[in-house]
A protein has these predicted regions:
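Bacterial Sec-dependent N-terminal signal peptides
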Residues: 1-27
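Sequence signature of WD/YWTD-type beta-propeller architectures
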Residues: 22-488
Length: 488
């Protein structure tokens, strides 16, 4: 057995797991807790429609603080260790500064007479971001999966609501809400346990589906919806969690078996392509290409686990998909070779314009959130060139991500800072693939992230609000039988 891993399966853990323009600021990533402001909004690029960047100063012993924010003739002055904007005032400032930079200047007087002066800028991009973000709020523990909720936030302001929660689902575990190409009318998520199912939001209707069968190794786990809305591609996984005894590592998760399946939502059918269900290969994390003509997924050779866990490395694969017949091709190709890069890939996501694919790279394995070395990587699908993303990545886990509908922004979950709590960060991508220093989701309360003891899990962008809420989902859990799917 691999030294350092306890091969101990804990049921509660299992439920948790399944269940470059002129003037633009590219900046540098910093995880230094001694930064003068928090959140770190210094020298970032933001969309013109983002909510106010409220923040506070981090110095000890502040006696007096003044912040001056200016753009041309517009000047705004804030006194005190917090800078909290009125929404309309902020929106007017962003609209006037679109395509240019806003200047920030602060003077801090500390106990003992010391004075600190700080200056920085925020660049305002004219590329709007999709106005809604969904995420799962969950405690970052191993055995805690109760009181889980999926929330939807308008990121143009601070309005937020639950679209599924523990209170309406008998404290069920639920898995994260994903959209197809950031479409509010095409999304899905799971409610696990008794009376649960996959909830498919398509064309104004929400359906409750049973995406499982005795012939499959498990119910569906990870996946994505085809751009047409007719199909879904999913993995079926036997997931094993184990604890490290090494002090610098916490939890290791791996699959002992995993295959891919195609769901036909029109015919209520599941298809298992033989080429994507080999016993000697572990296949997982499937997604569709932007045009729906291909499937990208991660694959690794089967091996003895957990003994060989540090040898388990996944490559990024591609196979054709016939969207008329709902069938895959027979000749998968390697897009990113794990042996060549000496790493392991997971969470691929294609940009809606078809130009980029972003994915997470770890040293090994397939469950990266407790791997501090995890970083985001992006490939140009037209040229095969890998983009340098040093400005985005940190010294903590940077993992799940999703694209905006115009392919100009992406959001990702990062544990930068304390290494425990995931927060949603945003970055801009220009036509050449150049990315900007990320900024965390703004909050009305500038102290919220220090006080919040839950992770923002699987952040996913959307071009509008979904047409359901926690109460309607709860009613479906209680009263609606899940539609059965037959394996063909």
């Amino acid at each position: 057995m691999q030294k350092g891993i306890l091969n101990k399966v804990i049921a509660a853990v299992f439920l948790l797991l399944v269940c470059a323009s002129c003037g633009r600021k590219y900046g540098e990533v910093s995880t230094n807790s001694a930064l003068p402001i928090y959140p770190d909004y210094m020298d970032v690029t933001v969309p013109v429609n983002i909510a106010p960047l409220n923040f506070h100063y981090t110095y000890d012993g502040i006696r007096k603080a003044r912040t001056v924010v200016s753009y041309k003739d517009a000047v705004h002055t804030f006194d005190g260790k917090e800078v909290v904007w009125e929404l309309q005032q902020w929106k007017q400032l962003l609209a006037s500064a679109q395509g240019d930079s806003i200047s920030f200047s602060s003077e801090i007087r500390l106990k003992g007479g010391k004075k600190e002066t700080i200056e920085w800028e925020v660049y305002v991009s004219g590329d709007k971001i999709d106005p809604y973000l969904s995420y799962r709020l969950i405690e970052p523990g191993y055995e805690v999966w109760h009181e889980v909720e999926i929330r939807e936030r308008c990121i143009e302001n601070f309005e937020e609501r639950a679209i599924s929660d523990w209170k309406n689902t008998n404290n069920s575990c639920m898995n994260c809400h994903i959209h197809s190409q950031a479409r509010a009318d095409l999304s899905m998520f799971y409610v696990r346990g008794k009376n649960g199912g996959a909830f498919l939001n398509r064309n104004g209707e929400v359906r409750k589906l049973a995406l499982n069968d005795k012939s499959l190794i498990s119910g569906t786990v990870y996946g994505e919806i085809h751009p047409s809305g007719r199909y879904g591609v999913f993995s079926t996984n036997i997931i094993i969690p184990g604890f490290h005894t090494q002090v610098n590592k916490r939890l290791e998760v791996y699959d002992t078996r995993s295959d891919l399946v195609i769901a036909d939502f029109d015919r209520n059918e599941l298809k298992v392509p033989e080429i994507l269900a080999r016993k000697d290969v572990l296949e997982t994390f499937p997604v569709f290409s932007a045009d729906g003509n291909s499937i990208y997924y991660c694959a690794a050779d089967s091996m003895t686990l957990p003994r060989d866990i540090e040898k388990l490395r996944y490559s990024l694969m591609k196979v054709g998909f016939d969207k008329e017949a709902g069938r895959t091709g027979q000749n998968p190709e390697v897009i990113w070779d794990a042996s060549e890069h000496n790493g392991s890939v997971c969470h691929p996501k294609c940009s809606p314009d078809g130009k980029w694919i972003m994915y997470t790279v770890a040293d090994y394995g397939t469950f990266p959130i407790w791997h501090s070395e995890c970083q985001l990587e992006m490939m140009n699908l037209h040229t095969g060139e890998i983009v340098n993303m040093d400005v985005v990545n940190s010294d903590r886990s940077d993992t799940y991500h999703s694209w905006s509908s115009d392919s100009r922004w992406f959001v990702f979950a990062s544990k930068r800072g304390d290494g425990k709590y995931g927060r949603p960060y945003f970055s801009h991508v220009d036509e050449n693939g150049r990315v900007t220093k990320p900024f965390v989701l703004p909050q009305e309360d500038p102290w919220l992230y220090e006080d919040c003891l839950r992770s923002f899990n699987i952040p996913d962008l959307s071009n509008g609000p979904v047409n359901f809420d926690a109460e309607s989902i709860g009613q479906m859990v209680r009263e609606v039988e899940a539609a059965r799917f037959a394996v063909k």
